[in-house]
């Protein structure tokens, strides 16, 4: 109940903040805000009624989701219609053409910042229709246009874009080398005042975008540091509560028994800290600054993990992949090690007893348990070492963060391998699947709501957003996604029967 109330309050606060930001942009801003509100509405209604003890059946949930989807599509069409009308007016004017928001393959609803992450997006035009202006000073623009050449990138058109400019043209060399050469020339002429991005537009053609350095990712503010600290304290408390529930008592009603729940908290922190160390080590290797981790407390398993944003621009998609995968790899290896040690150390009389049917809840865990414990899984109750529980929950936390959605580690991995378009599609598919699974699992409902509210948008493009990671990284990414699926997917009754899992 407390978690539900907190989620509702956070969602309402985000909606109010988004509405305030949208007002200065008129109808375009309001329509973009309404799209976000429509996406959140079914979940807010579901959580609100749930908190009041009213449960919506399957038919009601489907009606809410279908209605929300229909409204979202309608608002998107209205938003595109307004954008096309503005673009047509601009084309007929004597001033330069204003770049549409879709130039970088970024949809209109991504123009707002959701959660603690900044990104490169097109803001609604601030000039009057038909009178677009170039935000870059004329002298600087002339210097920027001078960096292009027939040996790197042959510029054909310059278009105003937010606080910078888009330079359409033809790529004449390898993307990585060209981006490095153009960036070096830009620094030689204008110092560190501008950033050069090489991205694909909607037509899959290389496009150069130059933005002022003032649009770099913002550093963590003192208020955000305080929030990170508050969330860390809350995670300590929920970790203790989850450990208490696991042992059959309520920490709030039996506060003096908190030492009994402490081992669970320690196991949880080992997983979370190893995850963050993985991110930090690779980020340090590439010279990328990270924000402090914003831990996500939950009563069910102690924590969902953490949200960490980039405070530096990323050189290319290889860097995005390495930093994104390093956290789950470190946390997953630690969790898997604890699970295997726990299974090996399990014996009759171990501290915890689990119904053997529990091991049917995960393809990976159930299979490993069968290999190690053998016929013990045919008994109604299975004695297990505490490390088994810690490792299993650590794998669940890692798998949840590897879901291919938005700014989750899995979403970043997919974006790095396949690009923004595919990552956007996998985000929608993930949310739909979570919505269906949540009908029988409240944990999936909470996670879906958090993704929808805080993490649904993609990462901002890399400086070189065209060069793809190598095949080895692509294979590692697919393996990680497969293992995450194996952790979260339950065994079918027939397969569990063939494996001899369940009394």
Model-derived features with residue positions:
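Hydrophobic transmembrane alpha-helices and their immediate loop junctions
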Residues: 1-503
């Amino acid at each position: 109940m407390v978690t539900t109330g907190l989620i509702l309050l956070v969602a309402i606060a985000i909606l109010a903040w988004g509405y305030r930001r949208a007002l200065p942009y008129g109808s375009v801003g309001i329509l973009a805000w309404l799209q976000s509100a429509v996406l959140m509405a079914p979940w807010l209604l579901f959580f609100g009624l749930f908190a009041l003890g009213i449960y919506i059946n399957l038919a009601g949930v489907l009606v809410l989701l279908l209605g929300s989807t229909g409204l979202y599509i309608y608002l998107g069409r209205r938003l595109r219609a307004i954008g096309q009308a503005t673009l047509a007016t601009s084309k007929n004017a004597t001033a330069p053409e204003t770049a549409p928001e879709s130039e970088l393959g970024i949809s209109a609803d991504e123009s707002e910042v959701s959660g603690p992450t900044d990104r490169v997006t097109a803001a609604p035009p601030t000039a009057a229709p038909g009178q677009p202006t170039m935000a870059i000073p004329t002298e600087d623009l002339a210097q920027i246009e001078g960096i292009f050449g027939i040996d790197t990138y042959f510029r054909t058109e310059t278009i105003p874009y937010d606080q910078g400019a888009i330079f359409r043209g033809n790529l004449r060399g390898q993307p990585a080398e060209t981006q490095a050469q153009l960036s070096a020339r830009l620094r030689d002429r204008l110092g560190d005042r501008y950033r050069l991005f090489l991205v694909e537009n909607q037509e899959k053609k290389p496009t150069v975008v130059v933005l002022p350095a003032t649009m770099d990712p913002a550093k963590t503010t003192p208020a955000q540091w305080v929030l990170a600290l508050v969330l860390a304290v809350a995670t300590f408390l929920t970790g203790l509560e989850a450990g208490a529930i696991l042992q059959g008592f309520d920490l709030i009603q039996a506060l003096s028994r908190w030492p009994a729940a402490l081992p669970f908290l320690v196991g949880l922190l080992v997983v979370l800290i190893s995850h963050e160390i993985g991110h930090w080590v690779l980020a340090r290797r590439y010279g990328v600054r990270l924000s402090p981790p914003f831990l996500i407390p939950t009563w069910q398993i102690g924590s969902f993990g953490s949200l960490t944003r980039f405070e530096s621009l990323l050189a290319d998609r290889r860097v995005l992949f390495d930093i994104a995968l390093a956290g789950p790899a470190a946390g997953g290896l630690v969790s898997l090690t604890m699970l295997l040690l726990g299974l090996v150390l399990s014996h009759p009389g171990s501290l915890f007893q689990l119904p053997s049917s529990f091991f049917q809840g995960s393809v990976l865990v159930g299979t490993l348990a069968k290999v190690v414990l053998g016929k013990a899984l045919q008994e109604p109750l299975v004695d297990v070492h505490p490390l088994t529980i810690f490792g299993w929950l650590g794998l669940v936390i890692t798998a949840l963060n590897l879901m291919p959605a938005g700014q989750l580690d899995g979403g970043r991995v997919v974006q790095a391998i396949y690009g923004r378009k595919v990552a956007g599609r996998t985000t929608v598919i993930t949310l739909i699947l979570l919505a269906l699974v949540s009908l029988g699992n409240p944990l999936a409902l909470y996670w879906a709501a958090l993704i929808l509210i805080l993490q649904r948008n993609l990462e901002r493009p890399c400086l070189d957003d065209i060069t793809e990671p190598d095949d080895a990284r692509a294979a590692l990414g697919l393996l990680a996604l497969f293992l995450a699926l194996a952790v979260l997917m339950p065994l079918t009754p027939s397969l569990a029967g063939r494996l001899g899992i369940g009394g």
